């Protein structure tokens, strides 16, 4: 009995001691955490306080150096923070200019040009009043849907210098998505007609890859109608009916080699732009040409001026209805001889379009080429050289040259929706929005011009009040 009691006593003591040990450990852990938080908080604050004088000194020294550097050179002020550069001396041949996104340079007497990026163009935050010596320059390589108001004469003619996708701009960017002629001639992804015919057992003749649905071109409505008459494998979010492998199923993989190998298996690829404007040509056209497929193209009405060969793409605009287009594609799909006429240029690397050849060989910038300037560098240097040209002219003859943008430098027609049989169209608020938005942008462009010509700052309320007056 005594032994039993003694055993129970020692067991109880063991659990009591264990309990106190656990409690003690927990307290120590919590104290440690508290001390760590206190130490960490003190260290961060202490380091920040120590760094403040040093950072201030470095910043003051850096700003002082930049101010000193720019004193002897014309200043090119990016009003849009596109480059992210606080200050840089840029060498453009024998000319040098100071490029910056720092708006405090606006009042500097050496500031000669204000550079804008079209997508970021904000009409209620402009460098007004505009000095006589300030030339405005517009860089806008993107679709009109990003900023429709710039595509009307009252707005585009506010600028002196332009770099847009239009061949008529001062620095045309029409070929911005084409690395070079070798990319077109390359046979890296080219698949034989025999293998493509074999692959047709599990693939549709046409591939469609779009995730920007219901854009101004209304391409999804056309493709939806086309799908009634011919099979289309649609990999993107728009009209999706086939999945890509997981490893390439994201936008960043569109330039991935594995994705290219998948598309290269198709005989035809639907190449539909998001907007219909002359010279607005994107990777939608160049990608199938590089892969050895036949692009079925809808977009720039003058695309034939840019094709490598007369018979290298099927132009959607030549067909009265998607059904007629489907019939033609089926004909080529069944007849290797007819199909191969569209691949002949690729097999022999025969690019006979003189306009395309001269554009690529003569352009002053490159695409994904570290040995060349990119098109932003070329844009900056174009303006820098023009500013210096006027500096030299003024020294010699007291007159300067005036550059002005024209309506053709950025010009697109109103977006039009396709109208097939009732009840067969895609219903989308976005689809219905584009034409009213375009018409509204005309009034916005007119209001913008009126207020800028007044040459003083204006508010958002003033802008919209004027827009509504033009209704």
UniProtKB/Swiss-Prot annotation:
An annotated GO cellular component: endoplasmic reticulum membrane
Residues carrying covalently attached carbohydrate according to the record: 102, 122, 160, 310, 457
Disulfide linkage: 381-384
Pathway membership, UniProt: Protein modification; protein glycosylation
Catalytic activity: L-threonyl-[protein] + GDP-beta-L-fucose = 3-O-(alpha-L-fucosyl)-L-threonyl-[protein] + GDP + H(+); L-seryl-[protein] + GDP-beta-L-fucose = 3-O-(alpha-L-fucosyl)-L-seryl-[protein] + GDP + H(+)
MF (Gene Ontology): alpha-(1->3)-fucosyltransferase activity; peptide-O-fucosyltransferase activity
Membrane topology annotation: Single-pass type II membrane protein
Top EC group: transferase
Keywords: Disulfide bond, Endoplasmic reticulum, Glycoprotein, Glycosyltransferase, Membrane, Signal-anchor, Transferase, Transmembrane, Transmembrane helix
Lumenal-side segments: 30-471
Top-rank lineage group of the source organism: Eukaryota
Role summary: Protein O-fucosyltransferase that specifically catalyzes O-fucosylation of serine or threonine residues in EMI domains of target proteins. Attaches fucose through an O-glycosidic linkage. O-fucosylation of EMI domain-containing proteins may be required for facilitating protein folding and secretion.
Protein known as: GDP-fucose protein O-fucosyltransferase 3
């Amino acid at each position: 009995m005594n032994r039993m009691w003694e055993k129970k006593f020692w067991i109880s003591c063991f659990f009591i001691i264990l309990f106190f040990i656990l409690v003690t450990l927990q307290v120590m852990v919590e104290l440690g955490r508290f001390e760590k938080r206190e130490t960490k908080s003190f260290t961060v604050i202490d380091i920040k306080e120590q760094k403040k004088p040093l950072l201030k000194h470095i910043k003051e020294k850096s700003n002082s150096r930049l101010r000193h550097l720019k004193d002897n050179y014309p200043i090119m002020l990016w009003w849009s923070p596109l480059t992210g550069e606080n200050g840089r001396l840029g060498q453009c041949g024998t000319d040098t200019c100071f490029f910056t996104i720092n708006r405090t340079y606006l009042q500097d007497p050496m500031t000669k040009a204000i550079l804008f990026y079209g997508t970021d163009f904000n009409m209620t935050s402009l460098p007004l009043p505009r000095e006589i010596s300030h030339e405005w320059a517009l860089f806008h390589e993107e679709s009109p849907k990003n900023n429709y108001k710039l595509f009307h004469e009252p707005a585009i003619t506010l600028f002196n210098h332009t770099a847009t996708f239009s061949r008529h701009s001062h620095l045309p960017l029409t070929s911005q998505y084409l690395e070079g002629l070798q990319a077109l001639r390359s046979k890296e992804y080219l698949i034989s007609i025999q293998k493509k015919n074999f692959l047709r057992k599990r693939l549709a003749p046409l591939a469609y890859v779009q995730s920007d649905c219901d854009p101004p071109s209304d391409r999804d409505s056309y493709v939806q109608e086309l799908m009634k008459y011919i099979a289309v494998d649609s990999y993107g979010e728009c009209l999706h009916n086939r999945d890509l492998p997981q490893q390439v199923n994201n936008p960043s993989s569109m330039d991935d080699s594995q994705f290219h190998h998948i598309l290269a298996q198709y005989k035809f690829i639907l190449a539909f732009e998001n907007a219909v404007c002359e010279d607005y040509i994107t990777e939608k056209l160049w990608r199938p040409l590089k892969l050895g497929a036949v692009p079925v193209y809808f977009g720039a009405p003058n695309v034939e001026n840019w094709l490598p060969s007369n018979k290298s793409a099927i132009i959607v605009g030549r067909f009265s209805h998607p059904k007629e287009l489907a019939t033609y594609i089926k004909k080529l799909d069944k007849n290797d001889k007819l199909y191969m006429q569209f691949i002949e240029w690729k097999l022999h690397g025969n690019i006979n379009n003189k306009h395309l050849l001269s554009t690529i060989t003569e352009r002053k910038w490159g695409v994904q080429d570290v040995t060349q300037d990119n098109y932003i560098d070329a844009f900056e240097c174009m303006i820098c050289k023009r500013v210096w040209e006027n500096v030299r002219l003024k020294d010699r003859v007291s007159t300067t040259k005036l550059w002005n943008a024209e309506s053709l430098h950025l010009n697109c027609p109103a977006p039009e929706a396709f109208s097939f049989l009732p009840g067969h169209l895609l219903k989308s608020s976005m689809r219905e929005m584009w034409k009213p938005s375009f018409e509204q942008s005309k009034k916005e462009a007119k209001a913008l011009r009126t207020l800028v010509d007044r040459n003083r700052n204006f508010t958002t309320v003033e802008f919209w009040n004027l827009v509504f007056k033009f209704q």
